[in-house]
Amino acid sequence: MTAHREAAGTAARAVGEGTRIVTLADRPDLVTAVPGVLDSRWPRFMLAGRPGHDVDLTDLLVRAPQHQVLLVDATDEVRGVGLSVPLEWDGSVADLPSGWDGAVTASADLLERGGRPNAACALSITLMPAVTGQGYAGEMIDALKRAAASAGAAALIAPVRPVLKARYPLVPMEQYLTWRTEDGEVFDPWLRLHLRVGGEVLGVAYPSMTISGTVAEWRYWVGMPLPGDGEYVIRGGLAPLTVDRAADLGIYREPNVWVVHREQI
């Protein structure tokens, strides 16, 4: 195995025995491992469908390597990724991007015109199943916050994908946000973690992410027949899939929750 040394003064940080978090700027050679991590957890349609933006996401992430964080184990295998992009944001709810797709589009435009970002937007934190539940999720949020701060950002915003929402796809996100545990905490554990480490809910982003495809493509992605027009509950979807067979089109419009981290940025 080839030995690698992270650049001094970067965001590289030990988070466990032999496990560390590095940025893509530290280890550009690890970019090829990112798709495999995403594929281990993301629903197939989120990776294969046509997104609601025309940005080459891999190119965008590579152009902002200091904003991408990787969880690397003792064998130098990538076990988790945290993806974020630079943005301009005035700090108000009104100036938030339209959602996940909007953040990707705005960041690509910013980099294309050479703008000066003052914020960062987290797109995803994804952990391989083998390391889930070991406390790394909070470390990855912290790593994205530190990466944002190192880049001069005043805030890290995120269109959060609540982890349990897929169990309740017919419940409006606004209603889902009001749910509480018996202890009075926010019901969703992923949102709850964001709040515990200093995040603040700003509101619902809808539609945050739009994915489209033909009826045949959707049938393959979701593994079920789609015999008529209308809405379908699909595995991994936070909201129903809408199918129009005459147009040979399926559209999935996902709601997310805007969260901002301002403290310690």
Model regions and ranges:
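Conserved acetyl-CoA-binding loop-helix of GNAT-fold acetyltransferases
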Residues: G133-S150, A155-A158
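Active-site acidic-Proline motif in GNAT/NAT acetyltransferases
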Residues: L127-A130
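Short hydrophobic/aromatic beta-strand or adjacent loop that forms the aromatic wall/cage
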Residues: Q66, R253-W258
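Short beta-strand-to-coil "C-cap" segments at the C-terminal boundary of structured domains/repeats
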Residues: V260-I265
